[in-house]
Curated annotation (Swiss-Prot):
Disulphide linkage map: none
Species per Swiss-Prot/TrEMBL record: Aliarcobacter butzleri (strain RM4018) (Arcobacter butzleri)
InterPro entries assigned: Ribosomal_bL27, Ribosomal_bL27_CS
GO biological process, one term: translation
HAMAP family registered for this protein in UniProt: Ribosomal_bL27
Pfam families tied to this protein: Ribosomal_L27
Domain of life assignment: Bacteria
Region annotated Disordered, chain positions: 1-23
Keywords: Ribonucleoprotein, Ribosomal protein
Name recorded for this polypeptide: Large ribosomal subunit protein bL27
Amino acid sequence: MAHKKGQGSTQNNRDSAGRRLGVKKYGGEVVRAGNIIIRQRGTRVHLGQNVGMGKDHTIYSLIDGVVKFEQKDKNRKKVSVYAAS
């Protein structure tokens, strides 16, 4: 028989790394075409003008310009990029 009792191991003591989501370029910032503006899960922020959406719902700029966050309706936000004039 064992002289010492075997050490138990814990099963639930793991965590995944953070996904680095969120706003990458804020309102008023100058962006180039292709710059990522927001990384998100689902469409927390919707598309405005001159922005595109990747398959993981990442919003990116289609033109060089300035980022502007706007209200789409009562409880939805959108982000647009307008050419710097």
